[in-house]
Regions:
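A short glycine-rich, His/Asp/Glu-containing loop-to-beta-strand
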Residues: 13-63, 114, 131-172
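Ligand-binding loop in jelly-roll beta-barrel domains
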Residues: 95-125
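C-terminal, non-catalytic macromolecule-binding modules
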Residues: 124-127, 138
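Histidine-centered metal-chelating micro-motifs
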Residues: 54-55, 72-74, 91-92, 96-105
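Short beta-strand segments
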Residues: 43-44, 68, 94, 118
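Glycine- and acidic-residue-biased ligand/ion/polar-headgroup-sensing regions
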Residues: 60-79, 87-90, 167-169, 173-185
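"Short basic amphipathic alpha-helical interaction patches in structured regions
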Residues: 79-86, 105-108, 130-134
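Hydrophobic transmembrane alpha-helices and immediately adjacent juxtamembrane helices
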Residues: 1-7
């Protein structure tokens, strides 16, 4: 389905938007996109043009999860300015009630690839925060969600995990889940 959706974007970013919640994107929905999945308000498979950037922009009351699939990103902004993201890095930014401003920049001469997910926080008005994770081979790394008493990730009922699965291996998930594969079948 991803390859049949319109490729859009802005500034130096091109993306295929799979989820666009009308709660955030009033009047901007694109044909074929889902209008949200639970607290998931946005899901995009994006690439930055060589030396492309998003320009400085703001977020408020949204949790932004960025997963680097290919290439690198240089992060500028009010949270962890100067951070570099490489393949398998996962950046989790909570805008909360105070919000944050940021710009993502491709420092390289070639395109890169990133998955971005926006989640609506379960509790409004939380303070802004920033976390970094690294996806591991053969192991699930929780990058978002979990009970309120834990502090390893932003607490939420929706859990987001990332992993690498070697060719020929399988992953079993009890209960219902949604998976997004960046390569393979």
């Amino acid at each position: 389905k991803r390859n049949h959706l319109r490729r859009g974007g802005f500034a130096g970013l091109r993306e295929t938007r799979l989820v666009m919640s009308p709660r955030i994107f009033r009047g901007q929905l694109e044909a074929g996109t889902l209008p949200g999945i639970g607290k998931c308000a946005y899901l995009a498979d994006a690439c930055f043009l060589p030396h492309g950037d998003t320009r400085m922009h703001e977020h408020k009351e949204v949790d932004v999860i960025s997963i680097m699939v290919d290439g690198r990103i240089h992060h500028e902004g009010s949270l962890e300015d100067g951070q570099e993201l490489e393949v398998d890095d996962v950046q989790v930014q909570r805008a909360g009630g105070e919000g944050f401003s940021h710009n993502e920049i491709n420092p390289d001469d070639s395109k890169n690839r990133m998955i971005q997910i926006w989640m609506i926080p379960e509790v409004a008005g939380e303070p802004a925060s920033y976390q970094m994770f690294k996806a591991q081979d053969g192991t699930r790394t929780r990058v978002y969600g979990g009970p309120p008493e834990q502090t390893d990730t932003i607490p939420a009922r929706t859990v987001i995990e990332v992993t690498h699965v070697a060719e020929g291996d399988t992953v079993e998930q009890p209960g219902s889940s949604l998976a997004y594969m960046t390569l393979g079948a």
